[in-house]
Design a protein with these regions (language model features):
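N-terminal, polar/charged subdomain of small-to-medium soluble alpha/beta proteins
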Residues: 1-121
Length: 121
């Protein structure tokens, strides 16, 4: 029996993170925040050894704190712009190799609408 192939990366993710966001290009969207769902998957270099303490790992709090900081900067016209800013924020961390960001506006129509982007260093 062959040994499974080892990956040189791990994945850290934040899924179904929802915040009120001032977003939208239309005048009617400037009046109040909308609920927006964020899904972020980031690839990090696999550590040389199994981490045993929090300072040895990339914390998902860095992702959620980054999203909160971007949203707090004020009104954003496009989900594409928001996704790009989040991707840049995550990629600014040296451990991150690539990131996929999905941003969904939850209050437009009967479902959700949004964008998903993948960026790498």
């Amino acid at each position: 029996m062959s040994e499974p192939e080892k990956s040189d990366t791990d994945r850290i993710f934040v899924h179904d993170f929802v915040l009120p966001v001032r977003i939208g290009a239309f005048d009617r969207e400037h009046d109040a925040p909308q609920q927006v769902r964020f899904n972020v998957d980031a690839r990090i270099a696999r550590p040389a050894r199994v981490p045993e303490r929090l300072p040895e790992v990339f914390s998902y709090d860095l992702i959620t704190d980054g999203i909160r900081a971007i949203v707090a900067q004020g009104h954003i016209h496009l989900v594409e712009t928001l996704a790009e800013r989040i991707a840049a924020s995550v990629l600014a961390h040296p451990q991150i190799l690539s990131v996929t960001v999905r941003v969904e506006k939850l209050e437009v129509g009967p479902g959700s609408v949004g964008v998903e982007i993948t960026r790498a260093k």
